[in-house]
Amino acid sequence: MPLNNPITSALLADPEIIQQNRLPFHAHFADQTSPEMPLAVSLDGEWAFHYAENLTAPFSDWDTLTVPGFIQMQSLQKPGQPYGTPHYVNTQYPWDGHEKLHPGQIPQDYNPIGEYQRSFTLPESWASCYLRLNGADSAAAVWCNDVYIGYTEDTFTPAEFDMTAAVHPGENTLTVQVYRFSSGSWLEDQDFWRMSGLFRSVELFTKPEIHLEDVFVKQDFTPDFSSATVTFDCKVSGAGTISVVFDGEEQSAEVGEPAEYDSGVVFGKGEADPDVEEDVQDVSFTFTVEHPTLWSAEQPNLYEAEIALLNEGALVERTGLKVGLRKFELKERQMLLNGKRIVFKGVNRHEWSCRTGRTVSREEMLWDVKNLKAHNVNAVRTSHYPNDPYFLSLCDEYGLYVIGETNLETHGTWQKLGADGSDEWTLPGARPEWRENVLARAEAMLERDKNHPAILIWSCGNESHGGKTLWEMSEYFRNTDPSRLVHYEGIFWNREYPATSDMESQMYTPVADIKKFLAEHPEKPFIMCEYSHAMGNSCGGITDYTEYAYEEPLYQGGFIWEYMDHGIAVTSPDGKPGFAYGGDFGDRPTDREFCVDGLVLPDRRNTPKMDAVKAAYAPLKITLTDTEAVIENRNLFTDLNAYDLVFASSVNGKPERRAVLRADCKPGGTEHIPFPFALPEAGLACMTVTAIQRAALPGIPAGYEAALGQVWHNYAVARLTLPAPQLVEMDCNVGVKGEGFEYIFGRGKGLVSIRYNGVQLLDDTVRPNFWRAPTNNDEGCAEPFTFAFWKTAGLYARCDNLTAETKGDFVIARANYTLPDGQTLPIDFAIDGAGRCDITMTWQGTRTELPEFGLLFPLRRELTEVSYLGLGPRETTADRTAGGKMGAWNYNVRQDFAQNTPVYPQECGSRTGVYSATVTGSGLNIGIGFAGDGMTFSALPYTPHELENARHLYELPRDDNKTVVRCAAFQRGVGGDNSWGAKPHADACFAVEKGTSFRFTIQK
């Protein structure tokens, strides 16, 4: 504990004290070197660490922790979790219910302090020494050799301090205290795990005799983009020569006696360090580029720039920059990139790693960017804070549009239990004591990230209601950087300052309501900053949104919530690997599994939802008739001739013919291309057209399948007629048998046995099924309550009567089921001499909606290999068929479940549009086949009820007890407009009425 410690609870709680001695913000330099000496030294690695529960509590014994990293994530790996655990809440604050607090107060009983300490030796060549904390959650104070250096808030932007006066030759001691809660915690109520620590890199750096303090690259274009002017506005300290090389041209200037440094707006009350003030001179260089190569997500062209600083002719500092030339503007109520109407096909992305929390490795960031590009995503909203600068550099390089979002969310100060409860405590509003705290966050982000071409829009934050302060922030963005637009969704909640946002931005609005809004309010372009809530098995109806972007010019796309599940990798008490979510560490209050709401699993495995995203966000829309392909080029800058168009026909999944064509079609155009050969007329005849990228682009290899379209027809196949099988009627059972097959129906039970070639295939009785394991979306709109009857209807349906007779070439057994409410359901089993069993279930009751309508087959455990003809290769649903491809597919039941199931167990694994399926098993030499006319099929290790009863995958029974096959006329769509009340769209809500029937076949 440092002897000189000015940090008090009052200081931490004061919203007007957000920094002490912090240096002015500036652009991030990813590439700054010197031939004379290292300009920076990383302090990442092991640090000494100890911990206290609050400001007055004693510290623990010294331990070691890794920097960068979160205290609580590393605590999970230690016996007894001595430094606390992560705490997940969504809108409510983590202290809610523990202490009664209002803005301007912070927890007293539980406000942990983590004190980090390490030694360092100053390089002999350094005449100055500065410290950079790239991320400290939520506030930090710094000492060097027991000399107090300074204090900072704002978790997600860098804080720099001058330590020159405190360091000495030889070994020095650096101490950093990190406070879990501060005044900034009221402004950081994002929907994520609450933790603390030095979670981004820590480094020392020095400044040579002449040093580039800052640079802002600005650009302008002629109306036809034939010429660009590029200006480098530089701030330089010291005296000497500055040289800028850009596009093959070099310009230089002498920097002499500089004017006194004007640091611009420095928000926040605090003590000024007289030794921090520097002399800085402004220098600008302007270049003209003829016929510039423009930057976009499709073609992320970057120019190289180099800024060299020389002292008496000797190079002392070199800074490399990558510059993307592009123009983003609002014109005639539309957002344009390089003169073209843009459509955002985006995701919201929290920073997350299942083992290290928001400390994300460069390898993970690169994987994310490549994965997004591989699924046709073109935009990212950095929800809800500035992301690591390396991620933004990857977006520049690989081509992703970015909404850079200010580290601001005050959701819990105004939204109470889902309703607008704004009052005098709502932040920031127009409360003067919070103004500079809020505005400083905008300045920190803009200054750090202003040179990234990927950033098209600055966002004022998330879900912080409205008011004057947010409007002032938007004006700061516009005045400082007019090359970008400003976004803020909160004007939806508070229309007092509508000019805060240049666009109308909403969350989770149904398409029908968007249409209505734009009909009444066509003043601005419209985006969905959050839509298609991806929690659990979700994203149904996503194409309704993407298609509307090409129907309504004012609707310019949106950002799916969200990219990744925020699960934490854990080992269950019985040794099984799994993922934890809110509440699993005893953290209360909590919002439980609401943090596992992403398109990819916590370990970055893609879920089937990503297949739908890739299809919905495709750069081409390919629609097939029976004779031609209609291709709509939705690119902004890429001609259709950048793709090979592969036409392929198949019958029953087997390839027939193939041809590769090319066509010219400008961006925004439509091309009609006749089939090079006819669609077959036998079996399941399918024509598939795929667009294959010809040349490699950043993140996308040559040969990448960018889009596809299909058309298919199922032609009936004549059956071989054989004599009827043998009917065996006894007191308790009815048997039907023939060569190589036997079915047994139990009186009072139904179908109890299926034997093919003498092998028993059933593990239990076949029964009607009307239930699916509730999804998160089902629970959010109370469908388990609404449809509760259907859970018991299938479980407890009673076979009251069984009849059997021979009719022509068939034996027909009829099982008459009575449901718990007295309704009846006859199921006919018509078995021919080959052992094929045509099953027809017919609804006799009144019209009603229900989750599923079909039969459940509990098969023996060995039957785990599935081959099917339908949409695949992975799960599709009634409202999420986009991304499914008609064809012949194979999977292992247990592996498919393990790879694709949501963290929170629920319905999964269904295949739609299935015409046939076969389930086999090793060692049995036999299997069972299912055939239907585009039915819904699933094969899982569990029943819907077993899935429903577990909260984590490791709570499920063993996965090798049985295989549960379900064949259904339909299964209700999964929905996804939101997870707290929205039902699936009407075309995915199915009903039965008197006479509704479902027919399919089982066979060996």
Regions found by a protein language model. Give the residues of each.
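Beta-strand/loop-rich accessory regions of lumenal/periplasmic or secreted enzymes
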Residues: 71-74, 83-89, 135, 180, ...
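Accessory beta-strand-rich segments of carbohydrate-active enzymes
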Residues: 3-8, 12-19, 30-34, 48-52, ...
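Catalytic cores of secreted or luminal carbohydrate-active enzymes
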Residues: 190-211, 566, 575-624, 634-642, ...
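Beta-strand-rich binding/interaction modules
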Residues: 144, 227-270, 283, 305, ...
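An acidic-aromatic loop/edge-strand motif
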Residues: 82-106, 153-155, 163, 167-227, ...
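Beta-strand-rich ligand-recognition modules
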Residues: 144-173, 177-191, 256-279, 284-295, ...
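Extended substrate-binding grooves/exosites of carbohydrate-active enzymes
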Residues: 2-35, 76-77, 89, 147, ...
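Short strand-edge motifs at loop-to-beta-strand transitions and within beta-strands
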Residues: 116-118, 157-161, 281-287, 669-675, ...
